[in-house]
């Protein structure tokens, strides 16, 4: 079924209404896979993006909102809280290329607030404050030799 706005639905119907499992292909190219009931879609489902990224979780009108997991085309994975399509509050990001992991707070999609970063290349752990994806404020680094360095970091 094709709608006047260009969206296209494939799935179950009951009494001429969207019902059961289905796919809604949005005019933007995003595909929602989930459950439908009486022409309404579930606030939890799978969103497939034209660039290959895949999101599983809560959404509001196909915008990531609430708790969810994003698997990026490059293999990186974010699991945590979303607000208005951005990583916000707390989550865990694993970077595919490096294998590094960040666990902590996010603001507007960037590491900001308190967080811990595990670096596989440097074999270090940074635990401290972040701002705009950079180490900023009080923090501690533990290196591969077990040495601990604490101090103030500035846009590092």
PLM ranges: what are they?
Residues 5, 28, 51, 74, ...:
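Acidic/polar residues in short coil/turn loops that connect beta-strands
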Residues 8-19, 31-42, 54-65, 77-88, ...:
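Conserved anchor residues at repeat-unit boundaries in beta-strand-based tandem repeats, strongest
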Residues 26-28, 49, 91:
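Generic detector of low-complexity/intrinsically disordered segments
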Residues 44, 90-99, 118-124:
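Short, charged helix-to-loop "capping" segments that act as catalytic/coupling loops
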């Amino acid at each position: 079924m094709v709608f006047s706005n260009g969206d296209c639905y494939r799935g179950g119907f009951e009494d001429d209404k969207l019902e059961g499992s289905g796919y809604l292909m949005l005019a933007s190219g995003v595909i929602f896979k989930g459950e439908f009931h009486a022409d309404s879609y579930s606030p939890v489902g799978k969103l497939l993006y034209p660039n290959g990224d895949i999101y599983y979780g809560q959404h509001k009108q196909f915008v990531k909102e609430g708790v969810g997991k994003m698997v990026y085309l490059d293999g990186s994975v974010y699991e945590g809280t979303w607000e208005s399509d951005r990583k916000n509050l707390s989550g865990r990001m694993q970077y595919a290329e490096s294998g590094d992991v960040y666990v902590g707070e996010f603001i507007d999609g960037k590491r900001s607030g308190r967080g811990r970063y595990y670096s596989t290349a440097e074999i270090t752990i940074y635990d401290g404050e972040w701002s705009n994806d950079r180490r900023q404020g009080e923090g501690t680094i533990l290196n591969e030799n077990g040495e601990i360095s604490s101090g103030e970091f500035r846009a590092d």
